[in-house]
Structures are given as structure tokens and as C-alpha cells.
């Protein structure tokens, strides 16, 4: 789209699993430009499906690093062809799919610092990587390395207290350990290891960008309290790892000015600042403008909770990261697998496949459901690890079935009580100023949101998050420009469009759920102990 009056702006990038996307946001925080490149469609020569290669073992999942480089070439050329005015860009930042790692070959820094504006990036960087297909977040091939890492630091809980999460197969430290063990030659030829986020930032900087605290928290390597690499974790993964990673930086740091390559080839101003890139989940927290005490609930195929925490309590479930917009605070992520598909199943079975009847069932049943509680996990749940359907009546006796309308309320109340219990297990507390931001498919259903407001005893707002990682990256660019750690993020984004109020707690809700929540938690423990057998 051609530009008319010049608009000073910041760019927000997102290097996600299936595409690279960019938005331009002006000083009034309006998104006025967006563009994207879809890997499968626009770069078919790499042969990806959903942006990745799934290997024969079904566990190893990688993406070609040059595909990401070429996607950046294409998107910049598209912007140039559309008449985008690069001279107005004050700063840029971005997001990357979390946990993925890129291995720069010895000598790559030299190539990055001496890019010729006459050639595209991928023509100049094709020999710069010691691993051409990089492990990404969908990879689950590192179980052995996870066990080694946990053993090295005294167990899963000890690792979680140190790094914010127990060992997960997709987390970067375990992926690095696998590469060192299986491909020691490639590892020894690697001079720098980047996350997808810091790799993308390096392309814009024309030199290696540091890893930021927030995305660095998804590696099982960063001590989240001290914001330094854990020597015990580094040593358990691979030798000489600290020098290949370099020290991490606060997420709002200006890491440098844009490379002269972009000034000469595209017309960026030489003073355009690059603000540290971060992970896509932390960038989404920025895009949704979460503040202290807030919680975001994404109600999709799986349900995800984003929490803003002051005093985290790392556990064997969920993930705690350094907060991307306030380095003194934290954020947590909790994933629940049984989301919208479970809601659809119960709708189909209980209320004749109709969402309006589903809503009527919620309206016609009382808060607390007369003490009837249910757990609905048709696929093995992550939080907690339970499968199956479990229903309990007022006396806490297991029952085989509920009437249709009771079943609907038991499902929705149960899903939200589980979210509150597990959030509080990580140190989250509902505050008087707490807002809940709801996104995803079920956020269009007013009655579902009413139950959410009642269970958490907090107002629920709905927000459009189609580009939340991109928009959050542009907001973070403005934040870095304004002085980062010295200026509250909320001050920088106060002009952004406000979310819409969708539900407020019903009178008496807090008393009902204060009584039910401990009961629900006890029943969850009961099911867990029955499915696991007695503790060892």
C-alpha cells in the first residue's frame, strides 16, 4: 500500500512457525501497515509443511535457517515495491517462535558486518551456519538430555526454581546438548548460538545481538532471579557454552543502530534503533498490554494463561519467564490441552450441538452448580496430568453422569477453577485492580465469559489479538526508544486502543467460589493419586 503523508513509526516483526510478519505502528499507536511471507506458500523450494520438517522418527522437528533469511529478503522487497517509506522508521523490534536455536559458523560475524547492499541477505549468508536445519519448539527428541540436565542440578524442582521450568524437550539447553552429543564437529565450528529472536535481531544489526532475559528464560539455562546463565546448567549441556551465548540483556535494551546494509538498500535512517527481540509469547504479553495483577486467557484449541507475577513460585508445571516489559517482575505461562474441542464435545452431547442452547444452560444453572463438580479431559491433560471424565456430586461422591445443563456448567466452571488454582500455584494472586483479558474463539460467548469473571472475581475484557506478537514488538520498540527500564511500559502505550468490557463478577460470586475452589483442588489431587498410584 503506498504511503501518503510521512508517518514516523516503529516496526514490529514476528518470525513465527509458519510465516514472517511485520506491522508498522505510528506515534498514536495505530497499526497502518502490515505485510507477511508464508513459508510453505511463498518459499516452496524449502519443502516445509506448516513451516517445519518433521523427521522420520516423528520426534525431531526442524526448520531451514536460510528459509527465514530469504523470507526477510522477500518481505523487505515487498515493502519497498509497495512504496513503504523506510526513512520514517524510528526503531524496530521483534519476536521469534520460542526455544528454537540457530548455530552461526566461525567467521559468520565477519560476513554479517560486511554485507553488500547490492545483494540479498540469503546470497551473502548461505555459508554462515554450522547447522542448516535448526531445532524448533515442536521438537521432542531430547528426553535423554532433559533427564541429564535435571540430574545435574538436583532434580526437576531444583531446575524449575533455578530456571523457571523443569526440563522440557523443546527448551534450548536440551537441544544444544543433543547437538553437542550427536554432532560434536558442527558444535565445535559454532562461534555463536542464537535464539530465533536474537538471530532475527542480528540480521538487522549486522552483528550478533544478545539474547534478552525474557526469551532467554525458555532455555533451561538462565537463572531467572539473578538474570545470569547458570554455570551448573551450562556445564551439563555442552562445553564452552557461555562464550557461544554471550551475556543476556534486559528485554527493553537498545542493542544498537540498524546495519548500514538496510540504510543503503532500503532507505532506513542511519539512526534507526534496534530494540532487543524477544519470544512470541512475551511479545504477546506486551501486545495485550498486561499490567501487574492482570491475566490473559487465550481460549482456543488449547487454552493458555498468561500471568503477570511479582513473586513467582516455580513448580513442576507451567513456565516462569522474566517479564519482557518490566525486568523486575515475571510472567508465567500455563497450557491446558482440553480447550475448545472439549467444549464442542460437551455442547454436542449435552445441548443438541447448539451454542445458543449451551449459553442457555449456563444461564439456567446457578453459580457453583449446586456443588456438582466435573473434570473433562478427553486427551491427556498437561495441567494436571489426568485423562478421562470425572464427575462428583455435592457429597464429593463420584457419579456417572449429570443432566445436560449441569454438565455444561460443570465443564466451564471446572475449566476456569483449574486455571485459577494452577495460576495461584505459581504465585499468582487476584488483586483489586486485576483485569482478565480474554481472546480466542470462546471469548465471543458472553455466558462463558460471565463464568470466567465469577470464578476469578474480576472483570473480563475482550481484545483483538490477531497480531499481538507483532504489535507488542512495535510497542516494545517505542518503549526502548523512550528509555526502556527508566520509563514504565504502561506510560508508553497509554494511547493504544482499549479492550472492551465484556463481563463483571455477579454479586455473591466470590463467596461461592471461595468455598468451591479448595474442594475442586482436593478432588483434583484425589484423581491424581488414584491414577498415579501411591507416591513412591
Swiss-Prot record:
Class of the enzyme per the UniProt entry, highest EC level: transferase
Protein EC: 2.7.1.17
Annotated binding of ATP, by residue: 355, 441-442, 445
Coiled-coil ranges from the UniProt annotation: none
Assigned GO CC terms: cytosol
Subunit structure: Monomer.
Protein name: Xylulose kinase
Gene source species: Homo sapiens
Lineage of the organism: Eukaryota, Metazoa, Chordata, Craniata, Vertebrata
Gene name, Swiss-Prot/TrEMBL: XYLB
Amino acid at each position: 500500500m503506498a504511503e501518503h503523508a510521512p508517518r514516523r513509526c516503529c516496526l514490529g516483526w514476528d518470525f513465527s512457525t509458519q510465516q514472517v510478519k511485520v506491522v508498522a505502528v505510528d506515534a498514536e499507536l495505530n497499526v497502518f501497515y502490515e505485510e507477511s511471507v508464508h513459508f510453505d506458500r511463498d518459499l516452496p523450494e524449502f519443502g516445509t509443511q506448516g513451516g517445519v520438517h518433521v523427521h522420520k522418527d516423528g520426534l525431531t522437528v526442524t526448520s531451514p535457517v536460510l528459509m527465514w533469511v530469504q523470507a526477510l529478503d522477500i518481505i523487505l522487497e515487498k515493502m519497498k515495491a509497495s512504496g513503504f517509506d523506510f526513512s520514517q522508521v524510528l526503531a524496530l523490534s521483534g519476536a521469534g517462535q520460542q526455544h528454537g536455536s540457530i548455530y552461526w559458523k566461525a567467521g559468520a560475524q565477519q560476513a554479517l558486518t560486511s554485507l553488500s547492499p547490492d545483494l540479498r541477505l540469503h546470497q551473502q549468508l548461505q555459508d554462515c551456519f554450522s547447522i542448516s536445519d535448526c531445532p524448533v519448539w515442536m521438537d521432542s527428541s531430547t528426553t535423554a538430555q532433559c533427564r541429564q540436565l535435571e540430574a545435574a542440578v538436583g532434580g526437576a524442582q531444583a531446575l524449575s526454581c533455578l530456571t523457571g521450568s523443569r526440563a522440557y524437550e523443546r527448551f534450548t539447553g536440551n537441544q544444544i546438548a543433543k547437538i553437542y552429543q550427536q554432532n560434536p564437529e558442527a558444535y565445535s565450528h559454532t562461534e555463536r548460538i542464537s535464539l530465533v529472536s536474537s538471530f532475527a535481531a542480528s540480521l538487522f544489526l549486522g552483528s550478533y545481538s544478545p539474547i534478552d532475559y525474557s526469551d532467554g528464560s525458555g532455555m533451561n539455562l538462565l537463572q531467572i532471579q539473578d538474570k545470569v546463565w547458570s554455570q551448573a546448567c551450562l556445564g551439563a549441556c555442552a562445553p564452552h557454552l557461555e562464550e557461544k551465548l554471550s551475556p543476556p540483556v534486559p528485554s527493553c535494551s537498545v542493542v544498537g543502530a540498524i546495519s548500514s546494509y538496510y540504510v543503503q538498500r532500503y532507505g532506513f535512517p542511519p539512526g534507526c534503533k534496534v530494540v532487543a527481540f524477544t519470544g512470541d509469547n512475551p511479545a504477546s504479553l506486551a501486545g495485550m498490554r498486561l499490567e501487574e495483577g492482570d491475566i490473559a486467557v487465550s481460549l482456543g484449541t488449547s487454552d493458555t494463561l498468561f500471568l503477570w507475577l511479582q513473586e513467582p513460585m516455580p513448580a513442576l508445571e507451567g513456565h516462569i519467564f522474566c517479564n519482557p516489559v518490566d525486568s523486575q517482575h515475571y510472567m508465567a505461562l500455563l497450557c491446558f490441552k482440553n480447550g475448545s474441542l472439549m467444549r464442542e464435545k460437551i455442547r454436542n452431547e449435552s445441548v443438541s450441538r447448539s451454542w445458543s442452547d449451551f449459553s442457555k444452560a449456563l444461564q439456567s444453572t446457578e453459580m457453583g452448580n449446586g456443588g456438582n463438580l466435573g473434570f473433562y479431559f478427553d486427551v491427556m491433560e498437561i495441567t494436571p496430568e489426568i485423562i478421562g471424565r470425572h464427575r462428583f456430586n455435592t457429597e464429593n461422591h463420584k457419579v456417572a453422569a449429570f443432566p445436560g445443563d449441569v454438565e455444561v456448567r460443570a465443564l466451564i466452571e471446572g475449566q476456569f477453577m483449574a486455571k485459577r488454582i494452577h495460576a495461584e500455584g505459581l504465585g499468582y494472586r487476584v488483586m483489586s485492580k486485576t483485569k482478565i483479558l480474554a481472546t480466542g474463539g470462546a471469548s465471543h460467548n458472553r455466558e462463558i465469559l460471565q463464568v470466567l469473571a465469577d470464578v476469578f472475581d474480576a472483570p473480563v475484557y475482550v481484545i483483538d489479538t490477531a497480531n499481538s506478537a507483532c504489535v507488542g514488538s512495535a510497542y516494545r520498540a517505542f518503549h526502548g526508544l523512550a528509555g526502556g527500564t527508566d520509563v514504565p511500559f504502561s506510560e508508553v502505550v497509554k494511547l493504544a486502543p482499549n479492550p472492551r468490557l465484556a463481563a463483571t463478577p455477579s454479586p455473591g460470586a466470590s463467596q461461592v467460589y471461595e468455598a468451591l475452589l479448595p474442594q475442586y483442588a482436593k478432588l483434583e489431587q484425589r484423581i491424581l493419586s488414584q491414577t498415579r498410584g501411591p507416591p513412591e
